[in-house]
Regions:
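Helix-to-loop junctions at the C-terminal end of transmembrane segments
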Residues: 64-75, 280-293
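Residue-level signature of mid-helix packing/kink "hotspots" within the transmembrane helices
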Residues: 57-65, 154-155, 274-282, 338
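Cytoplasmic membrane-interface "Motif A"-like loop-to-helix N-cap segments
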Residues: 73-84, 289-303
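Cytoplasmic helix-loop-helix junction between adjacent transmembrane helices
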Residues: 110-148
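C-terminal ends and interior cores of transmembrane alpha-helices
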Residues: 85-101, 303-319
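Extracytoplasmic gate region of multi-pass secondary transporters
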Residues: 31-36, 224-270
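Juxtamembrane intracellular "pre-TM" segments in multi-pass secondary transporters
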Residues: 1-11, 195-229
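Intracellular juxtamembrane helix-capping segments at the cytosolic ends
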Residues: 120-133, 338-352
Length: 363
């Protein structure tokens, strides 16, 4: 197994770090496929449920923007630990205080703040990858990184709650996320190495702020990075939008919902998106290292995702509660999503030496 990972470009010093990412993201993904339905069932509107995830995404974007530069400035492991501890602390407040209070502004605020944590954890690790892995193997290693990410947030993060929720209920299922996030944090502390280079050492506060600002200014100064960032945004609209709208569409009668699947059935259908990514994230990384990076994203990413998104809506309309056909749609979406797995690799190479963190912040 170790030799196989090394052939994929994963150095031994980072192997347990990849595992930490998978375990931590299992906790982060626990509520992804049923939070919007849970909120509607608690008496909130569909718009309020959607806004909750939208604002979470905005704060996650802020965390992602700062992650790369902070990791280069202060050390990736330090930023990963901060992000993980932030996530755990806010999650405790969200579950223990906000949800029981049923005060929507409090729920919205705490859930949004939690969104800062996980990008600091995972994207700081990508900075370490860029420093420890040669450019010729970086696409393959990045593909494996997204495989670990998908294993956590999508496979275990979708399938485990689908079996836990019928037994313990939706609210108690939220709490099962904590052990995974805590274990991932401990593994980060014990096994993730320090940066080879920490840019913030010896810099004044003014110079540090200037370095941090590069995560935004690079979008202006480097047109290729801007284009990659726009592609990333469009790609993620489906991956994070469908878990919000599809449970309302497939499992309720709210706002035109057709209510043909149970919530746990929907969770298992969506989980197939990420089961596929376990294979195709690594495959596309290997494939692009050998045959080029851009054209697979164009044809297997953009085009295939377009087909998958349309299929998710029309298959229930045409075939009813046909789980097998929905799984086929999930597989199509998974294959298309994976075709973008090397996008951060392309961005770091476009950025040039010493600006990988800024490029990943834009990502």
């Amino acid at each position: 197994m170790i030799r196989l990972l090394e052939r994929l470009g994963v150095p031994r010093v980072l192997m347990l770090g990849f595992l930490a990412v998978a375990i931590f993201m299992t906790g982060d993904g626990f509520e992804l496929t049923f939070l919007s339905k849970f909120m509607v069932d608690q008496g909130f509107t569909s718009s309020q449920a959607s806004l909750l995830v939208t604002v979470y995404g905005l704060f996650a974007a802020a965390g992602g923007w700062s992650a790369g530069m902070l990791a280069e400035m202060f050390g990736a492991r330090r930023v990963m630990m901060f992000g993980a501890c932030w996530w755990i602390g806010i999650h405790l407040l969200f579950l223990g205080v906000a949800i029981p209070s049923r005060i929507y502004p409090l729920i919205l605020g705490l859930y949004a703040l939690r969104g800062i944590g996980y990008p600091l954890f995972i994207y700081s690790f990508v900075v370490l990858m860029a420093q420890h892995i040669s450019p010729s193997r970086l696409a393959s290693a990045t593909g494996f990184f997204w495989t670990c990410f998908s294993l956590g947030i999508g496979v275990f993060g979708a399938y485990l709650p689908s079996f836990i929720m019928p037994v313990f209920g939706e609210y108690r299922t939220f709490w099962f996320a904590l052990p995974f996030s805590i274990v991932g944090t401990i593994m980060c502390f014990l096994f993730v190495p320090k940066n080879k280079v920490v840019k913030g050492e010896g810099l004044s506060r003014k110079e540090q702020l200037k370095e941090l600002a590069e995560g935004a200014t690079i979008l202006v100064t480097n047109r290729k990075i801007l284009i990659c960032a726009i592609i990333r945004i469009i790609n993620n609209l489906l991956l994070y939008g469908f878990p919000v709208i599809m449970p309302l569409y497939l499992c309720t009668t709210h706002n035109g919902g057709i209510n043909i699947f149970k919530t746990e059935e929907w969770m298992r259908i969506w989980g197939f998106v990420f089961v596929v990514t376990l294979i195709f994230n690594t495959f596309w990384g290997w494939f692009m290292d050998r045959f080029g990076w851009v054209w697979p994203m164009r044809w297997f990413g953009c085009a295939v995702l377009a087909v998958g998104s349309v299929a998710f809506y029309y298959i229930p309309q045409w075939f009813g509660a046909n789980a097998l056909m929905m799984i086929v749609a999930s597989i199509i979406v998974g294959i298309g999503t994976c075709a973008f797995s090397s996008l951060p690799t392309i961005m770091t190479l476009y950025a040039g030496e010493g600006k990988q963190g800024a490029a990943l912040s834009a990502y």
